[in-house]
């Protein structure tokens, strides 16, 4: 797992604003929304999911941002320089009250998710639970099973401008939120890097 750091809040804010402006226009354009619809290929039970066009990925800086983050991540973790970053696809998830994304994983080598809009409140426990973290609207990463001194899940509270990167096979889910009619808007992607760097166990 890698959280984007060190690239500057202003730069990330510009990307978020550019993408949100583009998305708002797509939402208003019914024919374009239908053309870019990606929901039938995804597992989410949410209001809308649609693919990003190549032009906006270039103009917003989203594609370069991903390439830079992944390159830095691989260098920090493996001390290796990637020579290939192929963005396979990127899409928007528009989630509203009581909607969710079940446990799933992605294709490619590297995947990730980031947050473009987050409601002010995501709800609270139905019962009084003082010592239990409320997870409505959270992104949860899942790997293996719980063992001694080792948790199998990691919960991420969504915050606008935060972006997370992980291997494509890492299972994850998004919990429903409640008591708020506002939109939770996220962005995801799949990408390939050098096969000899990704395939640490030898040739496939």
Language-model features, listed with the residues they occupy:
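Short, small-residue-biased leader/transition segments that mark boundaries at the very start
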Residues: 1-11
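Histidine-centered catalytic/metal-coordination loop motif
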Residues: 20-45
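Catalytic core of non-heme Fe(II) oxygenases with the double-stranded beta-helix
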Residues: 88-165, 175, 182-183, 197-202
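Signature of the catalytic double-stranded beta-helix
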Residues: 39-105
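Double-stranded beta-helix
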Residues: 188-204
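Short, charged beta-turn/beta-strand-edge "cap" motif at the junction between a beta-strand
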Residues: 170-173
């Amino acid at each position: 797992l890698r959280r984007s750091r060190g690239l500057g809040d202003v730069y990330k804010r510009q990307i978020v604003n550019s993408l949100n402006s583009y998305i708002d226009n797509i939402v208003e354009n019914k024919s374009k929304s239908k053309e870019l619809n990606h929901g039938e290929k995804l597992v989410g039970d949410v209001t809308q999911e649609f693919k990003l066009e190549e032009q906006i990925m270039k103009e917003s800086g989203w594609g370069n941002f991903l390439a830079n983050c992944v390159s830095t991540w691989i260098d920090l973790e493996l001390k290796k320089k990637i020579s290939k970053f192929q963005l396979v696809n990127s899409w928007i998830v528009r989630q509203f009250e009581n909607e969710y994304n079940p446990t799933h994983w992605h294709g490619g080598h590297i995947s990730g998710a980031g947050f473009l809009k987050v409601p002010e409140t995501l709800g609270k426990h139905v019962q009084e639970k003082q010592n239990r973290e409320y997870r409505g609207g959270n992104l949860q990463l899942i790997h293996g099973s719980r063992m001694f001194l080792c948790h199998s899940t990691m919960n991420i509270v969504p915050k606008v401008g935060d972006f997370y990167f992980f291997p494509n096979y890492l299972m994850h889910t998004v919990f429903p939120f409640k008591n708020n009619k506002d939109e939770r808007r996220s962005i995801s992607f799949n990408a390939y890097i050098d096969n000899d760097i990704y395939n640490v166990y030898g040739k496939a």
